[in-house]
């Protein structure tokens, strides 16, 4: 599968830069990141909380068929500008990774296309490098592909 989501991780830096263009208006791309029902579909996680506003918060989790929690994450929203920007923290629970800071920038390219740029900043280069050893690149690319397919039906 072609990796349409571009991931750049410069040596000796604490950040990952993610970019992806979508065949979606910027309003729909933004909605895909902020509407709990849509988020659940493309992220394949249950949204427990999503308070989309400055000083808001969010929480996701994924369970197996027996009800065991496989993944849980939460964060605080620091800035929320509709169709433009979200600045938030992101922390996975029950992992060695501390909270990271995420800057999500939404850009209109044309009436029907848009781009997201995500800058993720980690506590250290080592934590960033540990994240990159996981199937991170393939996972985010697959999630973005699902986002494109699911949200395209809303046009």
Regions from the PLM with identified roles:
Residues 20, 47-48, 72-79, 90, ...:
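Hydrophobic/aromatic beta-strand elements that line small-molecule binding cavities or substrate pockets
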Residues 29-30, 39, 58, 77, ...:
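Hydrophobic pocket/interface hotspot
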Residues 26, 52-53, 78-84, 105-115:
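A short, structured loop/turn motif at beta-sheet edges
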């Amino acid at each position: 599968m072609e990796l349409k989501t571009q991931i750049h991780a410069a040596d000796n830096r604490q950040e990952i830069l993610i970019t992806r263009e979508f065949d979606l208006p910027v309003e729909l791309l933004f909605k895909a990141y902020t509407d709990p029902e849509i988020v659940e579909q493309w992220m394949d996680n249950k949204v427990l909380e999503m308070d989309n506003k400055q000083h808001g918060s969010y929480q996701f989790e994924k369970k197996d068929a027996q009800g065991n929690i496989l993944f849980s994450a939460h964060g605080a929203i620091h800035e929320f500008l509709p169709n433009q920007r979200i600045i938030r923290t992101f922390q996975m629970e029950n992992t060695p990774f501390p909270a990271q800071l995420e800057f999500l920038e939404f850009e209109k390219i044309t009436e029907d296309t848009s781009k997201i740029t995500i800058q993720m900043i980690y506590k250290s280069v080592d934590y960033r490098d540990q994240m990159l050893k996981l199937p991170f690149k393939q996972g985010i690319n697959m999630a973005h592909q699902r986002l494109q397919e699911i949200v395209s039906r809303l046009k």
